[in-house]
Amino acid sequence: MLATDASPPVPLNVASPDCAEEFFAGAAVRCVTLRHAASLAELREVLERCLDDPAQTVTLDLIGHSTRGHRLLRLGRTPIDMLDPHVAGFFHALARDQLLTRLQVTAVRLLGCETAVTDAGQRTLRMLSHTVRLPVFGTRKPLFKSHSNSAGFDPAFAHILIEAAATRAGHGAGPVRSP
């Protein structure tokens, strides 16, 4: 099999329970496989349980509301802010333990409203990418249920994502294609 024949990564959808049900509710089937994590500890548990799943490349899609002001993704009550030593330590531990590598994660996407528009959001994207040594994407627009399909985030809307590295080159110089 050639590298170009590889199938695209599938999303590993992990949502904050405070938004998941209302966000994906409706007549259209959206995000069929959805796991919940209301804290970083629960996120770790979800990821460890996924080690038993069949091997395949995945994007780790963290789904939740963003905070007011800084627009940081929130899992439960915890904003994903890499300046917070607890949050940074959590992701350092994931990297040290190679948990994302063992899960074949190829990218992390912080799927909440406008998680890549503020300086704080862009800094978190860059620091998280540096820590986990993977591309990390945030959103440039508010997210709605229409941005999802049965698998999760709809690739047709990849243009509203921006990769952490692109935020260095002039505050979101343009989208970098999301996996």
Language model feature labels by segment:
Residues 31-39, 77, 81-89, 156-160, ...:
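A signal for specific C-terminal beta-sheet/loop modules enriched in small/flexible residues
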Residues 138-179:
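Caspase-like cysteine protease fold
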Residues 26, 46-48, 123, 149-152:
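Surface-exposed beta-strand edges and their flanking turn/coil or helix-capping segments
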Residues 62-63, 70-147:
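Catalytic cores of nucleophile-dependent amide-cleaving enzymes
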